[in-house]
Amino acid sequence: MEAAGYDLIVAGAGPAGSACAITAARAGARVLLLEKDHFPRHKVCGEFVSPESLELLRGLLGEKQLSYHTPVSAARIFVDGKTLAFPVSPAAQSIPRFELDARLFQAVQQAGALVREGVTIQQVRHEGAFQVETTHETFTAKAVVNATGRWSKLTQFEVVNKQNWLGLKAHFSEASPPQSVDLYFFTGGYCGVTPVDANTVNACAMVRADVARSLEEVFASEPRLLRRSRDWQPMFPAVTTSPLYFHEPQTEADGMVLVGDAAGFIDPFAGDGISLALQSGTLAAQMLTPFLRGKYSLEQARLEYQTAYRKRFVRAFRNAARLRTALAAPRWMRSVALTVAAMPGIGQMLVRGTRARSL
């Protein structure tokens, strides 16, 4: 059965897809947002929103503001028995995806877009108008935005790293956790720990599959993390995702505009994944709006988005990749790098280098 046409169909209702749908709907577009899951749900994520995107997030949420969040005012890096600490100023926020995604999804509906949960997209065809085929219906639209994540079946890219990496995440009880994002590095991976509230932390790891396949194995891989986690009690079963692959950011595939992890997956230790999702989704909607209003072609809109995306985001991806290489270097080289990073102002400069330029 073929359904009515739309100006824009957004595939995927994570932060990137919801930001895109909200922005386009507020600009007057007829928007359909399709999501394969149901809300609320947990996602593998460090749940860290950098300060550069907090104002954008508040604007997107409108009346659907978050009920709680926890400030993160410091960062600590634990590697090779050493600790590197520096302030995060202005403070970032720790926001559970369980609430964040659900509130953004509500804000999409508040903005006037139509939403469908539990819908799996089978394929997207571009023959003049776009035809989005789902299990039960086919929808048509002038443009399609792919926000279905880094390993979308709608697009496939050549990957940079061939190793099998996986992500794991769960919340654990911890009394009075520090208001810092703590990164524990070990051979074959790392684990980030951030406060969720006064009695809970989020532990999110990226690890090679030959090193660990559970969070308990991750914790055992770093002595200080093992000591810290001994009294932790899980708040829900761990969620996992794999494979984790990196590729050069790409803004378009098969005529669709790509946002969030579908466009590019930044190293999680950079702490900018949610911010990149919010900003790229918003930017895509802004660049598509003139096309949807008949002012210029879809090809020109995609080119405008590509140019703006590269200007604002590609530097962050490349700097994060350089840090990934440095962290995988021999121990003596890491020691030299840590000594340099500990110098006044260097740590903050490295963090700024992995941040997207704000809209």
Give the predicted meaning of each segment.
Residues Q123, D210-L288:
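FAD/FMN-dependent oxidoreductases across multiple families
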Residues A16, F39, W151:
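Conserved Rossmann-like nucleotide-cofactor binding loop
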Residues S53-F105:
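A conserved beta-strand/loop capping segment in the N-terminal third of enzymes
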Residues I9, A13, A25-C45:
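Glycine-rich FAD pyrophosphate-binding loop
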Residues A107-W232:
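Predominantly flavin-linked oxidoreductase catalytic cores and closely associated redox partners
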Residues H38-R58:
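Conserved N-terminal glycine-rich FAD pyrophosphate-binding loop of Rossmann-like flavoproteins
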Residues Q286-L359:
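C-terminal helical "tail/cap" subdomain of flavin- and related membrane-associated enzymes
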Residues E2-A16:
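Beta1/beta-strand and adjacent pyrophosphate-binding region of the FAD-binding site
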